Amino acid sequence: MSMVVAKIDWRQLYNFASRQALLGFCFDGIERLTKEFSEELKQNPMGRDLLMTWMGAAQQIRRQNMKVNAVAGKLYSKFREDGLRCCILKGQGNALMYPNPYSRTPGDIDVWVNASREQITEYAQKHFEIGDDIRFHHLETSFDGVPVELHFFPGIMNNSIYNVRLQKWFRRNADLQCSNVVSLPDGIGEIAIPTTAFNVIYQLTHLYHHFFDEGIGMRQIIDYYHVVCDFYKVYQNSSKITPSLFTIKEGSTSHPDPLTLRGEGGNRPTRCSEPLRSKVGGPSKVSPNCAGWDRRGVSGDTSSVSCSSVSGSSITSVRSASTTDPSASTALVVVQRELKYLGLWKFAGAVMFVLHEVLGLAEEKMIVPVDEKRGRLLLAEILDGGNFGRHFTKYAGFTHQSMGKKYFLKIWRNMHFVRFYPAEALCEPIFRTWHFFWRMKNKK
């Protein structure tokens, strides 16, 4: 490692971090290097101008996180007080998994509201300023100067068969995600975020969709790295479980050992610091078959838990896959079956390759086996496109073209992926064309 530090091209690293929206994250790592490799840094110092520029960017990211955290907490409280159950997707919930939650570059606030499209739209028209262009799965607005997306459902897939399955999976899991309340850093407020078991599948669908849309960047990959590591902590502690047993264990946390933020002088906010509950309308209803085996109450030896011990109706662990196989008693097996059922298995293998090659994810933490062929393709797209494909040089730089040119360039790009992901790649232009006319029809 010392040889690597001594040869770092700081300007090149800065440019890479900027393209991938990782300036705060990388600067946090540089601060660690100054403590662990001070002698090597004396031999290869960063220029003062670059250091000050980078430090300023990191401080700005920190302030942005504080702003977005405050608005997210306020927005969540507003929905809760108005009787709507919701959770905050990705974003600030993901930041809580980072060693320094202020180092992640924030984006907009994605809110999944557990209500019908009509209810959400009517509520948004009364309480927010919204445009006339409403997307199929969300509408866009802002709150206290921060961009907000109100989701009718968390995500979509291009292939209609897999999309129907995905929406059923979302509906089955919605209630528990809106009950998973966590504290934000420095006591600034609290929000509901999805459980780890939900995120390990949901955030993969998010990456998959954006891969065919405009591309994904390293920031999203690092987010998913933390999700996978968090999931590993969950299922290794109690691998034999009953996925339909989701009663709550008081005071349980995803991070049982409090971690101290460097330089913050306080405890790191825990991601599951409170028992699951609905603060509106009494106790939440725990959905059967939901992705919440990371927030369960199990007494005694969990290896002795069986489906027969669950009170009420007999529920299979992977109902969407139509199986009653008792071998699906581990969290990892359940996730793998869901990935296959939702058409995500091959892409998951590609992501595991990137997580291993770039971030050093250990094999025992992987949710599926590595797919090197698809993984190298994914990594090449990430490195060329940068954050959400904004820096593509190939495909005629399609993300910077006019709407008409972009339409055909996207088709051309996705045809490169047909032999790797035929179902999603072939359906992408069909879905995009349908979505265009749907938006025209539903303009307010």
Where does each model-flagged region fall?
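Conserved NTP-donor binding/palm subdomain of two-metal-ion nucleotidyltransferases/polymerases, i.e.
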Residues: M1-G107, W112-N237, S329-K444
